[in-house]
Amino acid sequence: KPVFNKEISSEVNVKAIFLNYVNAIGGIDVLNKVKSITTNASVKIPNAPFSPKAEIKQKHPNLNSLVMTVEGMGTLMSQKFDGENGYTEQMGQKIPFEKDQINSEKEKLGLFEEIYLDSSKMEIISLNQIEGKDLYKIKINETTFRYYDAKTYLLIMKEETSSQAGNEIKSITKYSNYKQIGGVLLAHKREVVSGPQTIVFKITSIKLNEEIDDSFFK
């Protein structure tokens, strides 16, 4: 039977957990050399009659793009952020990012956030067993929590609350199947849980340091 709220050693703090995570996935020297990440995935959407493909491109410090396509149907949706502004496009309709969305993207200062996040402003909330693993729950800010494995220090889960059209929406992203790519340990499975729906990204390839022009993110 899982024990909830296990005692946390006084030697453990957010800074130490972030450092252990950075070391676990490759170390700061290796991570600082990564200037872009291109991820391809097959996507499972519940009850959808098709399985989209996703291409995610990230470029240092915070440029990112997600494009989902379906064979024979073209682009299902795309979301882009160019460092200043962003938008989501779906069914030919372009919705610009709201101010808080832009600010939260701008706050990202690199591809591996744990390197530069100010741990002194964050706190460990608990050490609990979730799905058989002991996880440290860290409060990043009022709307974001992250869960790290107490044994491997890998990031297992992220919990975020955002407001869309006046409604609060909570989404959980689970990370698993970590594999090494170019000296960096990266999750090859992501599950995004939003409301009753779980979308599964099964990652088929990851490329580091591909040349990507800034204009791609516009």
Residue map of PLM features:
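A generic beta-sheet turn/junction motif
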Residues: N47, K59-H60, V70-G74, E131, ...
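N-terminal mature ectodomain segment of secretory-pathway/periplasmic proteins
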Residues: V3, S9, A16-G92, I124
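Short, surface-exposed linear segments at secondary-structure transitions and domain or protein termini
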Residues: P61-L66, Y87-Q90, K106-G110, Q180-G183, ...
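Flexible, processing/modification-adjacent segments and terminal tails
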Residues: S9-V12, D82-T144, S163-I169, F216-K218
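Generic beta-strand structural signal
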Residues: K59, K80-F81, Q129, Y148, ...
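Short, mixed charged/polar active-site loops
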Residues: P49-K53, G74-S78, K94, F145, ...
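Short, well-ordered turn and helix-capping elements at secondary-structure junctions
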Residues: I25, V43, V70-G72, S126-N128, ...
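Gly/Pro-enriched, hydrophobic low-complexity segments
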Residues: D134-K218
